[in-house]
Amino acid sequence: FMWLSNSSIGRKVVMSVTGIALVLFLTFHMAMNLVALVSANGYNMVCEFLGANWYALVATVGLAALFIIHIIYAFWLTMQNRKARGNERYAVVDKPKTVEWASQNMLVLGIIVIVGLGLHLVNFWAKMQLPELMHNMGVHTDMLTLSYAANGVYHIQNTFSNPVFVVLYLVWLGALWFHLTHGFWSSMQSLGWNNKVWINRWKCISNIYSTIVVVCFALVVVVFFIKSLMCSGAC
């Protein structure tokens, strides 16, 4: 398995596999968030099911590992590519028309996604699963915070009633869209679907999938923000 870290192809394979796994998680998370638009009780039931249970903790640790590996390999490959280009990267040249904007800016987009992820963890994970986990470990936990841990809808309402968070989340989702549109088909290319016919198909699928996911996430943000405006002073 040393080739996964010692060779450029191996690193790209690791990036691709971890990226696809994260895409699957995004799909699940998107579906879960859409439940909040239909049923507050249903969403809170899902949140309670995904609390500090052993299977949820295993999934959280696995997910964190995927993110960390994906991020490390992303920076590793970027530094490797820059080193390979040497002084050529400073030369002023016309960008090839076949090279997408997202491809040229994947590192910057990735950094925005990481910052957005940190914001998301602070607004949700740190207020939901973390208090339950600390309580189960015997660490003193504020009971009011603990009582709201499984109330996911409350945290969504509280976060997206703030216009600053709404704007930050929409910017984050925009960066995520660009990151996904390139990253998804690029992963498939690295895993062997690199002939012209399949690449074009994967690019189309990537654009459709990325748009659906980002629009659904953005829909939750916008709907709850509009609800907060409608309920202002009356709810």
Question: Can you say where each PLM-predicted feature lies in the sequence?
Answer:
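Membrane-embedded alpha-helical bundles that constitute the cytochrome b-like, heme-associated redox core
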Residues: 1-235
